[in-house]
Every structure is written in structure tokens, then in C-alpha cells.
């Protein structure tokens, strides 16, 4: 499973990307607004930091305007993925981008039938929002399971990008049910490394090693 960072903080992205474990980055208008920086500048910088797919979202609501904005975003760098909402106009734009060879991430997916339409429109990625479904009393992982089954039934190549991921358990569950990608906040990425028994075991190993008086170097 690929791991993307959901962030526009270029310093944090650079730091976490240095692990070699970051496969891509997703952004959205809210994160861009929080950055306080020009969108095109932020996306260009992220594209330089991470060679993998970088999702940049359109702000338009009509398919004509989405296509115009998407073309401008795609021109920033070869690894830009144009992010579009799962609306009727969004899917019309998605099909247009597919015809032009522009990668897309269809976002705000909350049902299997929406995901089916995204695949039929030629989406590169579809982003089911797991945490938001959980907030309303649904099981977001059921959505990923259903999408996985539909895509496997018909051989769709659209990748399932689990979004609105809140914690390590979400990451684990998304991997189990077959998500191709998970996008997570930097804090959750850092939490993936942690387990109290790892810390406890390392502490004991180092204590025992120190008692030997040896040095490897």
C-alpha cells in the first residue's frame, strides 16, 4: 500500500519524505488556505520535494472551469494529479482529463455507486472519506470493501485512495480491506512508527549492551 501525506507544510513534508516512506502528497483548499501562501507556489514546491503523485484541487464548480483550472495545475509539474469533486460536473471534467492523459483524484466519495461512476469516468484515484463516514455512524471500511469488490469485479484500474484517515487503526484497517493508497496527516504518519513495547524492548537491549563494555565501531 502506498502512503501519501495530507499536508501543505513543506518543511514537515521535506522532513518526513527523508524517511523514503512517503509515496505522494494530497492537498485541498482548506490546507492551502491554512498555509497562507499562493497555491501554485506551494504545489510547485511540494512537487520538487516528493517525486510521487501530488494532488492539487480545483476550486471551480462547472466542468468547463474545472478543466481550465485543472490544465493550469497539471502544467506545474509532471507529477501533479488534478483533484476534482465527485459531482456530475466533476465526472464530466474527469473524463475530459482522462482523454488528455491528465491524472485525476476524484474526491469526496461517500458511496460505492459514486466510486463506480468515478471509475467509469477514467479517474486515476477515487478518495472515499473514511473518518467523515465514521462521524455519522457508518463504517468507512465497509465503503472501501464495497469499492474494492466492484473494481475487482470489472477490472477497473482506478486506485482506491483512503482519505479522511484519523489514526493508525484506520491505516491498518484500510490496508486489510484492500485500499491501494492511504493519505494521512503528518502526526498520524509519525504515529505509525510507534509502539510502547518497541520502546521498552530497545531500552532493555541498550542497557544490556552497555553492560558488556563493547563497541561495534
Curated annotation (Swiss-Prot):
- Give EC number(s), comma-separated: 2.2.1.2
Quote a single Gene Ontology cellular component term: cytoplasm
Q: What domain of life is recorded for the organism?
A: Bacteria
Can you state which reaction this protein catalyses? Answer: D-sedoheptulose 7-phosphate + D-glyceraldehyde 3-phosphate = D-erythrose 4-phosphate + beta-D-fructose 6-phosphate
| Gene Ontology MF terms | aldehyde-lyase activity; transaldolase activity
Q: Note whether Manganese occurs among the keywords.
A: no
The principal localisation class reads cytoplasm
Functionally, this protein is described as follows: Transaldolase is important for the balance of metabolites in the pentose-phosphate pathway.
- Protein's name in the database: Probable transaldolase
Amino acid at each position: 500500500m502506498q502512503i501519501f501525506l495530507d499536508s501543505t507544510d513543506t518543511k514537515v513534508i521535506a522532513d518526513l519524505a527523508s524517511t523514503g516512506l512517503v509515496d505522494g502528497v494530497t492537498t485541498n483548499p482548506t490546507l492551502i488556505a491554512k498555509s497562507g501562501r499562493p497555491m501554485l507556489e506551494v504545489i510547485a514546491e511540494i512537487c520538487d520535494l516528493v517525486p510521487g503523485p501530488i494532488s492539487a484541487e480545483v476550486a471551480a464548480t462547472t466542468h468547463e472551469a474545472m478543466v481550465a483550472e485543472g490544465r493550469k495545475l497539471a502544467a506545474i509539474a509532471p507529477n501533479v494529479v488534478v483533484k476534482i469533486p465527485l459531482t456530475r460536473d466533476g465526472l464530466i471534467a474527469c473524463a475530459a482529463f482522462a482523454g488528455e492523459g491528465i491524472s485525476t483524484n476524484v474526491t469526496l466519495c461517500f458511496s460505492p455507486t459514486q466510486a463506480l461512476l468515478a471509475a467509469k469516468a477514467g479517474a486515476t484515484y477515487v478518495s472515499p472519506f473514511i473518518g467523515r463516514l465514521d462521524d455519522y455512524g457508518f463504517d468507512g471500511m465497509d465503503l472501501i470493501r464495497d469499492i474494492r469488490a466492484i473494481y475487482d469485479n470489472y477490472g477497473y484500474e482506478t486506485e482506491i485512495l483512503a482519505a479522511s484517515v484519523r489514526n493508525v487503526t484506520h491505516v491498518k484497517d484500510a490496508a486489510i480491506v484492500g485500499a491501494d493508497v492511504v493519505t494521512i496527516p503528518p502526526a498520524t504518519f509519525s504515529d505509525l512508527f510507534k509502539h510502547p513495547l518497541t520502546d521498552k524492548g530497545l531500552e532493555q537491549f541498550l542497557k544490556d549492551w552497555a553492560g558488556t563494555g563493547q563497541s561495534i565501531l
